[in-house]
Amino acid sequence: MISHYPLASLLPWPPVPQLLDIDGDGGVALQRYQPRSPETGPRYWSSVQDWGEEVEEGAIYNVTLKRVQIQQAANKGARWLGAEGDRLPPGHTVSQLETCKIRSIRAGTLERLVETLLTAFGDNDLTYTSIFLSTYRAFASTQSVLELLLDRYGSFEDCEGERSQCQTGESRKAVRKALASILRAWLDQCPEDFQEPPSYPSLHRVLGFLQKAMPGSEPMRRAQSLLEQLRVQASLENETEGGFQCINPFCLGEDEEVEIDLQEDFFSFEVDLVAEQLTYMDALLFKKVVPHHCLGSIWSQRDKKDGKQSAPTIRATITQFNAVTACVVSTILRQRQIRPHLCARIIQRWIDIAQECRIRKNFSSLRAIVSALQSNPLYRLKRTWASVAKDSMQMFEELSDIFSDQNNYLTSRELLMREGTSKFASLDSCAKDHQKRSQKRLQLQKDMGAMQGTIPYLGTFLTDLTMLDTALPDQVEGGLINFEKRRREFEVIAQIKLLQSACNSYCLTPDPAFFRWFKSQPQYSEEESYVLSCEVEGLGDNSPTSPKPRKSMVKRLSLLFLGNDSTNTSSPVRESPRSPPTGSSGESMDSVSVSSSDSSPSESDGMTPTHSIDAHLKKLSESSSCNSLHSMDTSSSTASASISLASPTLPGPPCNHRRSISLTPLMSPTSPGFPPAYNTQAQDACIIRVSLEQGNGNLYKSIMLTSQDKTPAVISRAMTKHNLEGEQAADYELVQVISEERELVIPDNANVFYAMSTSANFDFLLRLRGSEGRPVQLRSRCSSTLPRTQQRSSLSLRLSKVTL
């Protein structure tokens, strides 16, 4: 519905009577007068004005007024006859401003949200259907939405004389048209919702309705086509017996694996070919990502019993990221007796490949390569890094700075926003030789008309969506579904969809020879990588020309599986004796990886080499993006922290950390409704982290705490997060960890927001009543020394390998 309001009601100052004196008998009659501010003009006025709320039964609406410009006939007679302004010549129309009312639902019951699908267009909420279809899985199932949509609004033909449901023929026609539009959008935008082999009940239900209500219509043809497509896809998956990954052309079978001499074949592939093939694989996987799998409420369920197979498209992307990282490590460390200058050549080649990925706007493989080169087994090779050419070192610094964690990874976010939909990358390098080569390569691509898509680092979006899910409540007053939260989530999902569309610009061809070589690369565990690294350069090897220490500024994509805070200590520059192994069974290049098989905690409790974990774990507690990581719900069987023995020694300025929690690149810390930060009480709310005592405090869950929350409610929410629904909340007590020697037991009926200590970290424990308190395991935020060897043993046992 469009409602019209006097334009004067929207002016920034109160209207006053205006008089116009005209001397003489002649002149032009004044038909319309609009007062103007002497200081500002119309271009400074806001075209949208908040008008308040409208509350109905089961729904709350936000109402805004928007000024729109329309063309009307200048002649009164033409207006009276209903002539449309856009069909008249330019000289016969006048521009006028109209005010339209926009009603957007802020919260409501599921029934009202489904009903709004039919009325949103009339309320001028033009994006509602896309937002609902992209986010409804967080609060409803496909079957429940279909039941409400088709049974309640699609059965008018069966009604007989009931005015409450059976309206006029025109109304039925309008409802049928709206249903057709919704179903067509659903089938086009979310075909995965109907992937329910072998019977496909939801899709058959849609087909049954369309055959009865709209036979031969476009939505019906689309539904029939989708059914055939899903059946063919299911038959192919049954033949390969491997699910998602085996249908990828770069996932070769075991019989296709061949042993290849590593170094010879690595140098036999041109740098641009390697980057092109990595981009081909990443683009194929990213285009298959189902955007709603990234929602925090869905992604956080992956570790529950019924969620082991959830988000397969995200898992496939993470597995590919780890495979690239492992490939970088294996090519450098596999030749155990390699000389430093030869090892430096391999590193320089990977830096060149990373730059080629940058030219192709493949930020996923770019980050994987940089992350691997910054991992401890490679970063500790001081003599090797001393042999790397200065120009390559400078280029590596520039590529690393793209993923600087300062200001919530602002550099990478701005770069992604700037180049997300551009045809080519915008390169600016201080390394002269690389700059000339890159510009030449880029100019060649432009001359050939080969446009580039954009492959983002998916972890940024997962972090933002998880933070949104943690900070904003699912329900508001009266138990209504908080749909405003879904609008905020859709802002992030829309960016993912936009970049997926941009990936269609790539025109790449797979190279089977490269795939065979890539598939044949071993994936070393952190333990194995460190052993090989020590064989290349021993513990006592030092180079007088080693670059200055530099903190790693890149966290791997697999850190998104971390729900633990582990230990946040600063890293020393010196190396320390390595702890003896205790049976690590890792499959990745280091302890931060993802494998395609499940493992129990007992299988992944092995010891890994440890060092200062400042570069990764301090950032987990101090950088805002990593604050988002704290909110991820994970289990200890799928968590791991990247740890190593010595800080790499590349030059660069020290990292400065600043607290901010920008949820999307468009949000600012001062925007209204900004979610609270960890360790900060603001606007009567804060985020606390609750772990189980029997879990050694390693696995925590982030909880939104308000000034109204009492102890029993907080305990119940924490138990739900930790999958303890079957136990009684009265059997547990809430304890805040103050220091290694002190803790604060929150009283049973206290207001936790005011009872907690704000001078300590907001870290809490769930403890069974009557149990003896264990020694407090703190996640230090300021230690600058390496833990002793015996302390490292207990730390390593707390870090389990990431598996799917």
Swiss-Prot record:
Q: Where is the composition biased (Polar residues)?
A: 661-671
Keywords noted in UniProt:
Guanine-nucleotide releasing factor
Q: Where is this region: Disordered?
A: 564-611, 640-676
Domain N-terminal Ras-GEF span(s) in chain numbering: 101-231
* GO process terms (BP): Ras protein signal transduction
> Does the UniProt entry include the keyword Transcription regulation?
no
Which segments constitute the Ras-GEF domain?
270-539
The biased composition feature labelled Low complexity covers 581-607, 640-649
Q: Name one GO cellular component term.
A: plasma membrane
Q: Where is the Ras-associating domain?
A: 684-771
Name the InterPro entries on file: RA_dom, Ras-like_GEF, Ras-like_Gua-exchang_fac_N, Ras_G-nucl-exch_fac_CS, Ras_GEF_dom_sf, RASGEF_cat_dom, RASGEF_cat_dom_sf, RGL1_RA
GO MF annotations in UniProt: guanyl-nucleotide exchange factor activity
General function of this protein:
Probable guanine nucleotide exchange factor.
What's the protein here called? Ral guanine nucleotide dissociation stimulator-like 1
Origin species, per record, is Danio rerio
